[in-house]
Regions:
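Catalytic cores of enzymes
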Residues: 1-322
């Protein structure tokens, strides 16, 4: 758990039922807020056609500088204390950030020579209570996947149906709120190719946009499922409300509360082209089967090798859960 206050920053490391406190002297509360605000503006503008070339380049520099700061202020001291063994695959690490740190990609922190994904397979958890639920006995779940396309994501859906011809597809006018809520309990996995709205202040305004309205965080939390995985390939489905200091109430967490054991979500807006490329890379790993966290780790590694100097193209995807 990462704790940040006016008194300073600390990491609480829980390993083998032992708790270790690691001071984070370079983690300053005021600087963290300033960097978070700048980072959110940069990720919104780095690929925006309305921004000038100079503005997009400046946004790209801000993204890269934020990842370096995250490495130096948070990730490096945490990983130095943990000293994870070199292994293939790398060991798992669950990040439990608080405050403004919930909006930042801890899983992608790096200084150009060293980076978190080189050392561990990262997952996020909104609370320690949610983390405690991982690893509990599971019942068999239906393997048939559900694809919800309410964004005319033709390339993405074409890639998905080629990889998963058995999938149920709710597309266009058929992707209604009632149809989606009725279908979710009958499918072990769900892929949402939807637009999303995320309000940085008001949790209740966070929603996936469907054909006839919206699927809200409360809708997801009130309709329990027993399922393996939800993939939220929409804009900023993982970013929480900035006014919540102890818990990330967002669409991805709502899916966890609804019963999805793993959730893959985006922390900032991605384009439809990015989503299609991501789907083509992710799902072959999931077909093996590979645990979702490791499948995302492999997918991110491929994207990182393709776009080494453009972390906004490989770092938005985060895993929550088991």
């Amino acid at each position: 758990m990462l704790n940040l206050s006016q008194l300073g920053g600390h990491a609480l490391l829980l390993r083998d039922h032992r708790l270790t406190v690691v001071p984070l002297p370079r983690l300053d509360a005021r600087e963290a807020v300033e960097r978070c605000v700048a980072f959110l503006d940069a990720t919104a503008g780095v690929s925006a056609p309305a921004r000038t070339l100079d503005e997009r380049r400046a946004a790209g520099r801000t993204v890269r500088e934020t990842l370096v700061w995250l490495w130096e202020a948070v990730a490096a001291p945490v990983l130095e204390a943990l000293d994870p063994p070199r292994a293939d695959p790398p060991p798992r690490l669950w990040w439990c950030p608080t405050g403004v740190l919930t909006a930042l990609p801890l899983h992608a922190a790096g200084d150009g020579e060293r980076a978190v994904p080189d050392l561990v397979v990262s997952s996020h958890t909104p609370t320690l209570a949610a983390l405690a639920r991982t690893g509990q006995p599971q019942r068999p779940t239906p393997r048939r996947p559900l694809i919800v396309d309410a964004a005319n994501a033709h390339d993405e859906v074409a890639a998905l149906t080629e990889l998963m011809p058995e999938a149920t597809v709710l597309s266009g006018p058929a992707a209604t709120r009632a149809a989606v809520l009725a279908a979710l309990p009958r499918h072990g996995r769900a892929h949402f190719a939807c637009h999303a709205t995320v309000d940085p202040i008001h949790r209740e305004a966070n929603r996936l946009l469907l054909a006839d309205g919206a699927l809200t965080t409360d809708d997801l939390a009130r309709h329990p499922v027993d399922a393996d995985l939800a993939v939220l390939a929409a804009c900023a489905t993982g970013s929480g409300s900035l006014d919540l200091q102890d818990e990330a109430h967002h669409l991805a967490t709502a899916c966890q509360l609804a019963g999805y054991r793993s959730v893959i979500a985006t922390l900032w807006p991605v384009t439809t082209r990015q989503s299609a490329e991501f789907a083509r890379l992710l799902y072959p790993h999931l077909r093996h089967p590979t645990p979702p966290a490791l499948a995302l780790h492999h997918t991110t590694a491929t994207l990182r090798s393709r776009y080494p100097n453009s972390p906004w193209l490989w770092a938005p995807y985060a895993h929550l859960g088991e």
